[in-house]
Amino acid sequence: MSPTPIPREHLDVLDRATSLFGRALATDLDGDCAACPGWTRRDCANHVLGGGLRYAAYFTNEPESEIGWTRTADHAGDKPVPALHRTSAGLRKRLAKAPDTEALVPHRLAEIPVRDLLALRVFELVVHAHDLAPETWDHPDTADLAAWLNEHARDVVELMRAFDVLGQAGAVPLGADARTRLLALSGREPTGTAVGGGNPTSSS
């Protein structure tokens, strides 16, 4: 089978998810993050910003000793939105240049296809946007992003859950829309709190 690059429309999904998280970063980062027990709001922001650097490093199989600093640095600083775009640029380029969506990337927990790494990054951006600022999900674009994730991210999310980096999935009400189903998949109640006090999304 011939190699298949990531479709342009999937890169567009990544760009839209990045913009969504940027809107969440425009809110105050002080205080605790109720949806991620044990994390502050700044911890949540820094996890996502550092994740952009870590995901890019997986393409070149960088050792943990070279990327460990990204887990503790204050990437957000005083200008979190510009920091998001700066820390996301390298991964965006790697994904755009990836020759095959099925090629395996050595994620820290398991080898996964490039397409799943993309889906996991979009999942991280969209779900943590809700953790920081639930009102960002009122944006018309979020329903489409949630539907895309329900279709493309479910398998890799369940793989991450097997490593105990996500809380248990929530029950899905009958007739639930895409956003509600995505919150349930992520282990969150519609209010944004973790189901049963589960783990934050620490999949990167």
What are these regions (language model features)?
Residues S2-L20, A24-T40, R54-A76, P82-S204:
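Structured surface interface patches that mediate subunit assembly and partner/cofactor docking
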Residues R42-V48:
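Short, solvent-exposed alpha-helical surface patches in non-cytosolic proteins
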Residues L49-L53:
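Short alpha-helix boundary/capping elements
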